[in-house]
Amino acid sequence: MAGVMIAAPGSGSGKTMVTCGLLTLLKRKGYNPAAFKCGPDYIDGLFHRRVLGVENGNLDSFFETGTHMRQKLSRSMERHFVVAEGVMGYFDGLGGVSVQGSSFEIGSILGLPAILVVDGRGASLSLMALIQGFLEYDAMLEGKGEEKTHDKTDCDAECAAGMQYEECRKRRWKENEENYREKKSHTSNGLHGCVCGNTDCHESKGKKNNNIRGIFFNRMSPMIYNRIKPMVEELFRIPVIGYLPELNFLHVGSRHLGLVLPDEIDGIREQLEQLADRMDENLEWEPLLKIAAEAGGRDREVPVREEAGAGQQTGNVAGIKPGNKLGNEPGNILHFRLGIARDEAFCFYYEDNLRAMEQAGARLVYFSLLHQEKLPDGLDGLILGGGYPENHGEALAANRTMRDSVAAAAATGMPILAECGGYLYLLDSLEGADGTVYPMAGVLKGHGYRAGKTGRFGYITLGPNRCLPYLREGEEIKGHEFHYWDCDCGEDEFCMTAAKPKGGRSWPCMRTAKQVMAGFPHLYYPSCPGLVRRFAGQCVEYGQRHDRKHDRQERNGQEHDGEEHEL
């Protein structure tokens, strides 16, 4: 078992490029790497999967239970050297003032050691203060997010006698802070206690190891690196495992949803090979492999919040047995052909969502709304994911036969789930990135337009306002919103309510028409197994109504049909 997390003090520090360079190098050296992205991001995963050709997925402590994340990581580490790319700054979580959902929390839950990528551009000795702050804050949190479930076994007699959790948390936080401020002529290294080496020293007693196990400098000159590396290692007793200088050949731009897509960067594969060459020159393998070997061994069994992945069961991705609720016994899987739109315009999918559908009997059929004239024959359902349809408005509008094919399928009652960009495609019209208004599929009334800002952004929990085709009143499903386009439909057309986990803000969202459910939120299907079961069941029923068998009683594993279009 081997794995590391690539984390950083903030976005823009070089996490994605360091991750991609390391994955390229690991693959080159025969380590069979796999990649995970912490949090709800899709685009970084596209770099991992499309450009590098490595398995990838997401680790998300808001969407998933700790048990499910551990199982997923453990399965991957049985066959791969795992590299998990962090999200935003290492401690940044929900609401901007919590570690919930942060890289730190995910690493604490999984016992996954972190390599902190520190951007050295325009700084030198000041980086020492930054590193010390991260190490000490990491240790002060003691592997417990400040809003985790209260466990009285961790508390003293006074607390066990009845101290309220909030009061207990504040007191323990204050004690930890005071302990770290009390130096008494000793220097804390934030990792192994005091540099004096005395294990009985007040700085060493009771201190737990950091998740941060190594430092990697980005955009640093060789001269500064050779001077600062021994200073960091001597003062903080933490290995500095390498650096990258400023790389003028590597240029990865960004747009409103993050990094540009891999296919939009000329020569990206060649650039990453050059990046791997430079990492090979400046990366210290022995300490990296030693750190990676600790993965899983430091699992602290952090209590997982009840709301983290609530409703999701464990054992398989969707928390369901194949064939559940479909009128057949497990093992006799009723297959259905599920069309997945995947091309340059529609490419945002959680791999866990696709696996959940496969476990429910789906045989995935990838197709392109841009390049194919019509839907593949014999589909029983559709999922239209997010992406950048606004950048391809002219081509989507010109493909009239595909728009008509999707509209006809919806009119016959085909089960369809559409998210964000997929939702925009189902509208009457869409304002493209060039300002031109283009006709779309016309399945749902409304016009998609550039809003100019992210009016709704971040994690959400959604609940239906009435019984819906795939959801029942009282059920909840988790999701994420991030979009600069909006729709001019009225609020009375929405069928669900989205609520932020912090701050209490909520808003109406999602629309239905026949068996179509669509909206801006990207849903995490495994957080609501009922949605997966009902959608799968209705896909099977749709195929039966249209007298299609697709060898539904096959006992063999599901296979992928169709081609996945290169991005």
Task: Please state what every model-predicted region is.
Residues L125-H150, R172, N176, C194-G197, ...:
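Internal gly/pro-rich beta-alpha loop/helix module
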Residues M5, V83-E85, I115, F216, ...:
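Structural motif
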Residues F336-R400, D404-A409:
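Phosphate-binding active sites in nucleotide-utilizing proteins
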